[in-house]
């Protein structure tokens, strides 16, 4: 008898996971609380853009969507910093300046993944199903006005997961909210073209707050403000909004003709890091943000969730299709990696909002890139290891420490050699 799998959540991870499982010949029911977003439009409050990099592309390639994703994306090979005076400074993401992260519409990618899941034999999509509970012992799911049952239930329903809530009794659960929120705004095309360089992620670093802008294929930019929530609340009139932006982001104001109206109309989202254990209870397991929501400052949320799907699929192969063994292996493989990228994402907020504007940081970045070019793969920056490889997140800090020790030893040897040469020359004199 074919096992029936329930995936709760038809977002990015849920759709990818359903497709991977269907390719194993499994019957998969995907339950989504929203109406079909391909017909209902984007959900308010969700980030409009995603940054997809090597990990996400590797996962999407397994269902034949990597090339389509790149065709719909805009590559960003570095970041452009906007100072208070309007001066610009560019920092490439890679040593040779060629590697890029890719700006893509969240809605567009979700639609492509929904289409791919719907095409897969054995997948059934159920929209308008809001989960109210799941029994981890029986696999029984309760929705508003309906019930279902599955052999395995996979919760891919986001940071505020209803599946996680159903199994969280006795769970080691931590939800840490930043005092900052986020709000999205728009820089429209200017005379039919991009108002800013589209090959770059734009950052207005202002210490405790910042604004970023990512390009869209319609030649607009989606801007995201990261401010203390009290600052958002204080700007309650068009005049106050414009005054604050003229003070903090003066060069952006002329590019945003609907700034005040958009600011007052658009919601403020929360920034939360979720860590929990166990991810697996009985017939139920958590995937993506439901297991490990992270803040967006390394652009790895979707990439990390996609890696979960790949690891779960890989664990099924390793276990010979034994679900309890596969789920246990999946959690063991992914938990440390999720914790590692959660920490790095939090650290990157400080880098993006403060450090990138520092001349010292810029010099360090140039030196790191010089080392990468000189040492040919023996030294790779943390950013490149995270964004442009599939090396497990949990291994990156250890590799960085080993690199630093090696570089320190090489630098010490070079300095010693220079010193010895100077002494020898002095003696010859």
Where are these regions (language model features)?
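Conserved FAD-binding catalytic core of PHBH/FMO-like flavoproteins
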Residues: 115, 120, 129-133, 138-267, ...
């Amino acid at each position: 008898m074919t096992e029936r799998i329930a995936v709760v959540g038809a977002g990015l991870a849920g759709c990818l996971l359903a497709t991977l499982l269907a390719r194993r010949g499994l019957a998969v029911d995907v339950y989504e609380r929203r109406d079909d977003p391909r017909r209902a439009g984007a959900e308010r409050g969700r980030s409009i853009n995603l940054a997809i990099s090597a990990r996400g592309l590797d996962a999407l390639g397994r269902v034949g969507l990597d090339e389509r994703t790149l065709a719909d994306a805009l590559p960003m090979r570095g970041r452009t910093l906007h100072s208070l005076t309007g001066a610009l400074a560019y920092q490439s993401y890679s040593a040779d300046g060629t590697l890029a992260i890719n700006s893509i519409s969240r809605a567009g990618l979700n639609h492509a993944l929904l289409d791919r899941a719907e095409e897969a034999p054995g997948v059934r999509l159920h929209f308008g199903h809001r989960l109210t509970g799941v029994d981890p012992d029986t696999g029984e799911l309760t929705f508003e006005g309906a019930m279902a049952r599955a052999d395995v239930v996979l919760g891919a329903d986001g940071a505020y997961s209803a599946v996680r809530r159903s199994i969280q009794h006795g769970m080691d659960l931590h939800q840490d909210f930043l005092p900052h929120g986020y709000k999205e705004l728009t820089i429209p095309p200017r005379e039919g073209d991009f108002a800013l360089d589209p090959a770059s992620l734009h950052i207005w670093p202002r210490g405790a707050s910042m604004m970023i802008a990512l390009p869209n294929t319609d030649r607009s930019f989606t801007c995201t403000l990261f401010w203390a929530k009290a600052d958002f609340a204080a700007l309650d009139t068009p005049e106050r909004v414009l005054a604050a932006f003229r003070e903090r982001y003066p060069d952006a104001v002329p590019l945003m003709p609907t700034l005040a109206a958009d600011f007052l109309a658009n919601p403020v989202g929360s920034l939360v890091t979720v860590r929990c254990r166990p991810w697996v209870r009985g017939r139920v397991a958590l995937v993506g943000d439901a297991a490990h929501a992270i803040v967006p400052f390394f652009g790895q949320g979707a990439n990390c969730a996609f890696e979960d799907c790949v690891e779960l699929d890989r664990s099924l192969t390793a276990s010979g299709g034994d679900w309890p063994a596969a789920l246990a292996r999946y959690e063991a493989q992914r938990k440390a990696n999720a914790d590692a990228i959660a920490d790095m994402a939090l650290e990157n907020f400080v880098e993006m909002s403060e450090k990138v504007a520092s001349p010292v940081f810029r010099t360090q970045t140039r030196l790191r890139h010089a080392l990468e070019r000189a040492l040919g793969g023996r030294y790779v920056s943390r950013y490149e290891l995270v964004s442009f490889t599939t090396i497990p997140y949990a291994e990156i800090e250890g590799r960085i420490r080993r690199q630093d020790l090696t570089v320190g030893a090489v630098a010490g040897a070079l300095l010693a050699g220079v010193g010895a040469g100077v002494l020898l020359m002095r003696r010859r004199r």
